[in-house]
From Swiss-Prot:
Homotetramer. This is Aldehyde dehydrogenase family 3 member F1. NAD(+) binds at G192, S193, P194, K195, I196, G197. It comes from Arabidopsis thaliana. Induction: Not induced by abscisic acid (ABA), dehydration and salt stress. Its EC number is 1.2.1.3.
Length: 484
C-alpha cells in the first residue's frame, strides 16, 4: 500500500501541475482528448465486448447498446457542441446596475476524481470522463475491481490514447479507494450504492469538495391496464426488457417492482412468462443473451432476499439459483410482503415483484413509503394519473410508457434525488457537472451614487428602499426633489 500511496501522490502532483499550466483549458486540447476516446472505443470494439463478456456475460449487442454506443454518442455530441457549451453566457442586468455588464463563464474545477461502477464498467467510466475533459479538468479514473477485465482494459489502453499527464487510471479495491479519498480533490464523481455514497460524501466533506453521486433505489413501474390495453404486448416486452434485458437487472434504473391492479395481475404474469422464454429460450442459464450475476457475493445476496419464507411463498415463476455459475433464474413474485427485505432494498438482479392494488391510483401511496427512486416508470394514457405522479412523487426522472430509455437521451439530465443521488450529468449537463459557473460583473467608474455610502440619512434610506423595489420613476422624482 505504501507504493500505491506514492503512486497516488505522484499522479496528483503531475495532474495539478498540468492543470496549472493551462493546457486543459484549450478547447482544441479537450476536443482532441475526447476524439481519442472515440477512436479508442472504435479501435478496440472486439476487446471491449470480450472484456464485458468475461466480466458479466454480456452479449456483444447488449454491450454496444448499453456501453460502447453510449460512449461513442457522448463523445460525438461533446465534440460537436463544446464550442457552444463553453461560450460565456451574457446576463441581462436590471436597470438598477446600469451601466454595469454581467456574464457567467464556465471554468473547470481542477483535478477531478471519477469512481466508476462494475455493472456498466465502460460507459460509467468513459461517459463522466468525457464530461470532465470537456469542462477542462485533469482526471483520475478509478475503475471497479469487480469488473477486472474491463478495468484492466481501461488501465492499459487509456494511456495509449490520452494525455497521460492530465488523465490517469488506477486499478484496485476498497483499500485503493480509501487512499484516494484521503487526498483533496476539486470534484468527486461517484457511481454506486447509497451505502458507499455516504462514505464518499463524508470523505469529501473533510475538504468541502463538491460531489456528484449517481446512486440507485427501487424504481417502480406503474401499469394502468385500463388505458394501455391496446398496447399491452409492447408494455410487457418493455417491462421484461427493463428487468432482464440490461445487465440482468443489475442496473440502477432497472425496473425494480411493478404496481398493478389486482384484477389484471394474473394476465400480466401469464404474458411475462412466454416473453421471458422468447427473449432467453427455455433454459435462460444457457442463453447467450442473459448477463450473469457479477459474483458469488451478489448471488448470495439475492438468495438471501428470496430465502424469507413469505417471499418464497410469493414465487410464481423461476426462483432457481446456481451459485457456481453465477446464475439466478428470471423470477416473478406476486405480492411479497411490503415489509420484507426484498421490498425495502434495491434488488439489483433478475427478481421482479408484482405488487397489487385495488385501484391504480393507490400506487402513488406505496411509492411514497420508500426513499425517492432514481426513476419512476408509468404505463398510462390517463392524464390525471400522469399529473398526480408528477406532482405527488419525487424521483430523479419520470418516464411514461417506456423504461430506461431516458438514460440514452443526452438532451435530458440524468441523476437522482435524496437517497438516489446528488447532481446530474449527460450531454450539456455533464459539462455543467464538471464546471464552476463563475459570475463576472464589470462596473463603471463614470457614475457614483452617494446613497451607497455613509453618513446615513432619511433621503438615502428612501433612495435604497426605492432602488430595491426598482421603482425607477419614483427614484427620479426623489433625485429631482419632487418626492420625499
Amino acid at each position: 500500500m505504501e507504493a500505491m500511496k506514492e503512486t497516488v501522490e505522484e499522479s496528483l502532483r503531475e495532474m495539478r501541475e498540468t492543470f496549472a499550466s493551462g493546457r486543459t483549458r484549450s478547447l482544441k486540447w479537450r476536443k482532441a482528448q475526447i476524439g481519442a476516446i472515440y477512436e479508442m472505443v472504435k479501435d478496440n470494439e472486439d476487446k471491449i465486448c470480450n472484456a464485458l463478456f468475461q466480466d458479466l456475460g454480456k452479449h456483444s449487442t447488449e454491450a454496444f447498446r448499453d456501453e460502447l454506443g453510449v460512449v461513442l454518442r457522448t463523445a460525438t455530441v461533446a465534440i460537436n457542441c463544446l464550442d457552444k457549451w463553453a461560450v460565456p453566457k451574457h446576463s441581462k442586468l436590471p436597470l438598477l446596475f446600469y451601466p454595469a455588464k454581467g456574464k457567467v463563464i464556465s471554468e473547470p474545477y481542477g483535478t477531478v476524481l471519477v469512481l466508476s461502477s462494475w455493472n456498466f464498467p465502460i460507459s460509467l467510466s468513459l461517459d463522466p470522463l468525457i464530461g470532465a475533459i470537456a469542462a477542462g479538468n485533469t482526471v483520475l479514473l478509478k475503475s471497479s475491481e469487480l469488473s477486472p477485465n474491463a478495468s484492466a482494459f481501461l488501465a492499459k489502453t487509456i494511456p495509449a490514447y490520452l494525455d497521460t499527464k492530465a488523465i490517469k487510471v488506477i486499478e484496485g479495491g476498497p483499500d485503493v479507494a480509501t487512499i484516494l479519498l484521503q487526498h483533496q480533490w476539486d470534484k468527486i464523481f461517484f457511481t454506486g450504492s447509497p451505502k458507499i455514497g455516504r462514505i464518499i460524501m463524508a470523505a469529501a466533506a473533510q475538504h468541502l469538495t463538491p460531489v456528484t453521486l449517481e446512486l440507485g433505489g427501487k424504481c417502480p413501474t406503474i401499469v394502468d391496464h385500463h388505458t394501455i390495453s391496446k398496447n399491452i404486448k409492447s408494455v410487457v416486452k418493455r417491462i421484461a426488457g427493463g428487468k432482464w434485458g440490461s445487465c440482468n437487472g443489475q442496473a440502477c434504473i432497472s425496473v425494480d417492482y411493478v404496481l398493478i391492479e389486482k384484477s389484471f395481475a394474473p394476465t400480466l404474469i401469464d404474458m411475462l412468462k412466454p416473453t421471458i422464454k422468447s427473449f432467453f429460450g427455455e433454459n435462460p442459464k444457457e442463453s447467450g443473451c442473459l448477463s450473469r450475476i457479477a459474483n458469488k457475493h451478489h448471488v448470495q445476496r439475492l438468495s438471501r432476499l428470496l430465502s424469507d419464507p413469505r417471499v418464497q411463498a410469493s414465487i410464481v415463476y423461476g426462483g432457481s439459483i446456481d451459485e457456481d455459475k453465477l446464475y439466478v433464474e428470471p423470477t416473478i413474485l406476486l405480492d411479497p410482503p411490503l415489509d420484507s427485505e426484498i421490498m425495502n432494498e434495491e434488488i439489483f438482479g433478475p427478481i421482479l415483484p408484482i405488487i397489487t392494488v385495488r385501484d391504480i391510483q393507490e400506487s402513488i401511496g406505496i411509492i411514497n413509503t420508500k426513499p425517492k427512486p432514481l426513476a419512476i416508470y408509468a404505463f398510462t394514457n390517463d392524464e390525471n394519473l400522469k399529473t398526480r405522479i408528477l406532482s405527488e412523487t419525487s424521483s430523479g426522472s419520470v418516464t411514461f410508457n417506456d423504461v430506461m430509455i431516458q438514460y440514452m437521451c443526452d438532451a435530458l439530465p440524468f441523476g437522482g434525488v435524496g437517497e438516489s443521488g446528488i447532481g446530474r450529468y449527460h450531454g450539456k449537463y455533464s459539462f455543467d457537472c464538471f464546471s464552476h459557473e463563475k459570475a463576472i460583473m464589470e462596473g463603471s467608474l463614470g457614475m457614483d451614487l452617494e446613497a451607497r455610502y455613509p453618513p446615513w440619512n432619511n433621503f438615502k434610506l428612501t433612495f435604497i428602499r426605492l432602488a430595491f423595489r426598482e421603482a425607477y420613476f419614483k427614484l427620479i422624482l426623489l433625485m429631482l426633489g419632487l418626492k420625499r
